[in-house]
Amino acid sequence: MSIVFSDRFRYTLVVSSYKERIFLKHSLIRFSAVVLTIAFVFALTGCGSGSNSFTWFVDCIPANLDPQVASASADVIACENLYSGLVRKDPSGKYEPALCERWEKSSDGLTYTFYLKDGLTYTAAKGNATDYAITAEDFVFAFRRLFRAETNSPYAVEFAALENSAAVLAGQMPESALGVTASGPLTLVFHLSSADDNFLEKLTLPGAMPCDEEFFNSTRGTYGLNASSSLSSGSFYIYNWTASGLFLRRAPSDSLIDSLRLVQNTNSAGQSAAELIANEKCSAAPDDTAAPTTLTSLSYSDTTWSLLFNCSSVFASTELRQALASAARGAAEVPDGGLYAAANGLVPDGLTVDGMNYRDTAGDVTPAAVDARALYLTARQTLTTSDFNKVSLMVPAGSGVTSAAEEINGVWQKEFSLFFSVEEVDEETFAKRLAEGDYTIALAPISAEGGSVYNMLNQFTAAGGGLTGYADSLYATQLQASTQATGSSRCRLLGDCERQLLNDAVAVPLFAQQKRLLIAPGIQNLIFDPFGPVLDLAYTTKE
């Protein structure tokens, strides 16, 4: 079973084989696209209220089903099952038509022409048919919405290669200048300013789903915010949407899952993932323990525990950070319990950027060996003993990393005669102080939200939250440049940023935290995104 993590909003875990089901707006169907790439094939069993139902616990009930803006995990899960796009991937990773009959790509890679299927329409709530046909104009309107500043779409960055996209987003050119045009009701043409080898991959993202302009305008600002202002072009339709959950259905067909329940775990909060599945409270569940289980499990990692130095404190000194970082690397053993592994960088192994393995493309980011003692002595020339009086190493209680923090602290005492306290605080306090910069050193979990390398690195910029108070114009410039690049160029720019963070000892990656999805036997053809988490049940069956 191979795992590939994507630098977008999902990664797909494909269980068994696909069988596409597509539903009917003004003239086409849209298959709920898989937004990230991690392809697996395995079997799962769903539990729920019906014989062919699937229940998934969400942190919060879906609130926004507008595919051009959906980014919260529950919203993306819903969009995954409500909408279809131009193309989709089969289990082998090959792209195949979804709402289109076929497509053509120019020899220079700058023009893509899609020929849409005829006669497809959107489906309203309760499975009611509509007269809204899916046409090429729906895709034109959807992409124009992506590049409206007021939309604030998280997907715009993925389509930076579209002709005039930056100028349209900045308001310097009209929407009509965007490189997406309709040549008739069923012919859609994309014009790129630079070739993007992963353009088809990006067309599986929610933001690339069709949007009927007439229907959108009729909702008067409530598009995707309630059942009556939403239309389905994918596998499922909205059956009910209340404060209790979002309930999706489709017409029964053999062993296909025909009911998807997105609800909160309100009555079984004390049960483990394995217990929830065994007690038929849910059909699959993420698990962050290493407890033995007979259930099928899928392991992955999106989090790296790292030492963080607050650059607004005494650790504004790069030499001091580098000295302590050098001594800390390898000082702590990987915590027991099976949840952790030694980190190879800040970005977890397995993530991809534009379909490319990030780590393989970006290369090794391990800082070169340094003379830690010499760096420390250089730093001390501008520091006094009193500068270290309030330094502590903050860790979250119950995380299992306190012993590692104490080992590192012991090495600093031995190597530099620095006596810091290890400060263990509850999880809520830890998160609050980290966000407010109220710490000097912290051993903290740094996550790649949505499986995105960019999102992970952006946390170290002022615009992204200023996690450590690090302010470097080169870092910010290169990270911003990565949003305009694609493929290997994007990987290299992101790799340079990661390398700079580690060389400057802003963050010192220590342990990759392992997670897993637990699944009960019997469910097949499930597409799973551990970073959302996102589930696509278009082809999921229950034996």
Q: Can you name each region flagged by the protein language model?
A:
Residues 57-107, 151, 231-232:
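N-terminal lobe/hinge region of extracytoplasmic solute-binding protein
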Residues 102-158, 315-316:
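Aromatic- and charge-enriched surface segment that lines or borders ligand/interaction sites
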Residues 137, 189, 302-353, 389-401, ...:
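Alpha-helical secondary-structure segments
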Residues 173-177, 184-186, 191-264:
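Gly/Pro-rich hinge or "lid" segments in bacterial periplasmic/extracellular proteins
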Residues 239-249, 258-312, 334-335:
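Extracellular/periplasmic solute-recognition and catalytic clefts
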Residues 338-381, 398-403:
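Structural transition elements
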Residues 419-430, 455-521, 543:
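Extracytoplasmic/peripheral linker and loop segments enriched in polar/acidic and small residues
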Residues 517-543:
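Long beta-strand-rich cores associated with HINT superfamily self-processing modules
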